Amino acid sequence: MWNQKHDLESAQTPLYPMMSESPELRWSFIRKVYSIISIQLLVTIAVAATVVKVHSISVFFTTTTAGFALYILLILTPLIVMCPLYYYHQKHPVNYLLLGIFTVALAFAVGLTCAFTSGKVILESVILTAVVVISLTLYTFWAAKRGHDFNFLGPFLFGAVIVLMVFSFIQILFPLGKISVMIYGCLASIIFCGYIVYDTDNLIKRHSYDEYIWAAVSLYLDVINLFLSLLTLLRAVDS
């Protein structure tokens, strides 16, 4: 009985000062978003583990022309699907269908990246990602409760991602060596840590209740990009 009363009082406590909406509704929305993200991460782990374990899959992608073409398609698919996903993210069941395609395609790309990485580096990246994501999420909820706002990070993070994209393009055309890869991985990790805080703050304060798919996509991308950034950094250190 005491626990039920305590939970009810916790649910009625505002998540941030001057909160005008119902805390129960916002908490329900937050739980729904994190449930979707959890399913996405489980699908990603299952698909990526299959790609890593079944050696013939990575061999097909790296040694055949059809495999290379399919790899390019898998890389482009999440980018292509994000356009209709943004447009239909409030339209059920199309939003879930597009989300599934987006998640599976990205999971394949993650799996192929992990297929050429040592198990130790993958494990280190997974542990670091989990610790950082949980820590930053708890911090953002704590900071929001005390009136801190992280909306100002948006323009800076967007500009930083543009710099990363240009740096990646240069790296493809003119490989800059191990040190440059380490610097890239370190900077990318910091940037996506910022995005986790920024998108969690949006989840708490700004997303409408119908934007659960887009909120989940944003945080899922933050987690995956942080993992890949740490993987890049640790792989360069390990080489």
From Swiss-Prot:
InterPro entries: Bax_inhibitor_1-related (IPR006214). Disruption phenotype: Delayed development of the powdery mildew fungus E.cruciferarum. Increased cell death upon A.alternata f.sp. lycopersici (AAL) toxin treatment. Expressed in seedlings, roots, leaves, inflorescences and flowers. The keyword Metal-binding does not apply. It is a multi-pass membrane protein. Regulates the brassinosteroid (BR) signaling pathway that mediates cell elongation and organ morphogenesis. It comes from Arabidopsis thaliana. Belongs to the BI1 family. One of its GO terms (biological process) is unidimensional cell growth. It holds the Pfam family Bax1-I. The chain crosses the membrane at residues 41-61, 66-86, 96-116, 121-141, 156-176, 179-199, 213-233. Induction: Repressed by Brz, a triazole compound that acts as a brassinosteroid (BR)-specific inhibitor. GO terms for cellular component: membrane. Coiled coil: none annotated. This is Protein LIFEGUARD 2. Keywords: Brassinosteroid signaling pathway, Developmental protein, Membrane, Plant defense, Transmembrane, Transmembrane helix. The lineage of its organism: Eukaryota, Viridiplantae, Streptophyta, Embryophyta, Tracheophyta. It is found in: Membrane.
